[in-house]
């Protein structure tokens, strides 16, 4: 953790909010035009994806706030808890990279790898919480830290869910464009 990195996350989230507003306004205006069936599907899919990307940025702020609270209260995870959260963080970085790369490059093969990773992250989330409860019962972790761990895990899980949504929108759009024709 560093203040510079935390501020960078906050600055980027503020930019994402501005981009979200502008892109959503543009796509909404565009959707009111006389679009082809294909273009209409693409605009709708983009609107959903943009919303999910914006929500991911909101969760990044929540993560920063949790880490800042840990520093302020001088709380640290146990060695095992830190290892688990580092693994969880690496999985989240992986799913974010896959999702953004798939979206930017319209890479369907990469998009197909997101959902299986999201399911692994779901299991990792359950394991982290279960292991934390064991440490709590053994007195190896505090209740305050447990609440922060729960907040971090929830935000990580939601980031993974939004990544999954984006990948699914991409795959559904491709399927609709391949297998559906507009009504006469």
Indicate where each model-derived feature is located:
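Cytosolic, long alpha-helical scaffolding segments
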Residues: 1-181
């Amino acid at each position: 953790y560093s203040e510079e990195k935390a501020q960078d996350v906050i600055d980027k989230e503020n930019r994402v909010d501005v981009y979200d507003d502008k892109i959503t306004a543009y796509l909404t205006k565009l959707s009111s035009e006389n679009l082809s069936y294909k273009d209409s599907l693409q605009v709708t899919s983009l609107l959903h994806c943009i919303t999910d990307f914006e929500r991911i940025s909101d969760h990044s702020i929540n993560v920063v706030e949790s880490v800042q609270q840990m520093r302020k209260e001088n709380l640290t995870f146990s060695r095992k808890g830190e290892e688990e959260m580092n693994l969880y963080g690496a999985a989240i970085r992986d799913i974010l990279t896959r999702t953004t790369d798939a979206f930017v490059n319209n890479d369907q093969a990469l998009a197909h790898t997101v959902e299986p990773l999201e399911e692994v992250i779901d299991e990792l989330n359950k394991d982290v919480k279960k292991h934390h409860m064991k440490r709590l019962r053994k007195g190896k972790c505090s209740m305050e830290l447990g609440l922060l761990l729960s907040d971090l895990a929830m935000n990580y899980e939601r980031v993974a869910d939004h990544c999954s949504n984006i990948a699914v929108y991409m795959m559904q759009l491709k399927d609709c464009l391949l297998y559906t024709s507009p009504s006469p």
